[in-house]
């Protein structure tokens, strides 16, 4: 049985990030705010990928929601890693990462 773990950013940074390169049969999705002070938490690899978009449904002035292209990239990354465990985080560990985790869980037959 595959695990889908959803975390907030601080939990991810403190508990998961130091062990990312050691974990087997797992892939990681990092969702950051576009104006975060850091570029990425980890370099993108076959098992780790970062996207940046705000937790909003549609663009509001300079605040950008997820784009169709980003959604497609996330889907393709998930398909490439299908069958592995997923650890996904966003700032609070609720909406964006929760939606990605729910999608993967349903894809696996949830």
Language-model-derived ranges and their functions:
Residues 37-39, 59, 95-99:
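Short catalytic/ligand-binding loop motif for oxyanion handling, primarily in non-cytosolic enzymes
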Residues 41-43:
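Non-transmembrane, aqueous-exposed alpha-helical and coiled segments at domain scale
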Residues 27-29, 47-51:
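Hydrophobic/aromatic beta-strand patches that form the interior of the parallel beta-sheet core
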Residues 49-87:
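Helix-loop module immediately N-terminal to the HCX5R catalytic loop
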Residues 1-37:
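Cys-based phosphatase fold recognition centered on the PTP superfamily
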Residues 78-108:
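Catalytic cysteine-centered active loop of the rhodanese-like fold, especially the PTP/DSP P-loop
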Residues 32, 54, 91:
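Anionic group-transfer/hydrolysis microenvironments
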């Amino acid at each position: 049985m595959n695990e889908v773990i959803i975390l907030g950013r601080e939990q991810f940074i403190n508990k998961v990030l130091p062990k990312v390169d050691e974990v087997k049969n797992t892939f990681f999705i990092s969702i950051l705010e576009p104006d975060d002070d850091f570029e990425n938490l980890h370099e993108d690899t076959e098992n780790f990928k970062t996207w940046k978009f705000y937790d909003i449904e549609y663009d509001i002035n300079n605040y950008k929601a997820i784009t169709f292209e980003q959604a497609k990239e996330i889907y393709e990354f998930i398909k490439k890693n299908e069958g592995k465990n997923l650890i996904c985080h966003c700032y609070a560990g609720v909406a964006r990462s929760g939606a990605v985790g729910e999608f993967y869980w349903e894809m696996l037959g949830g």
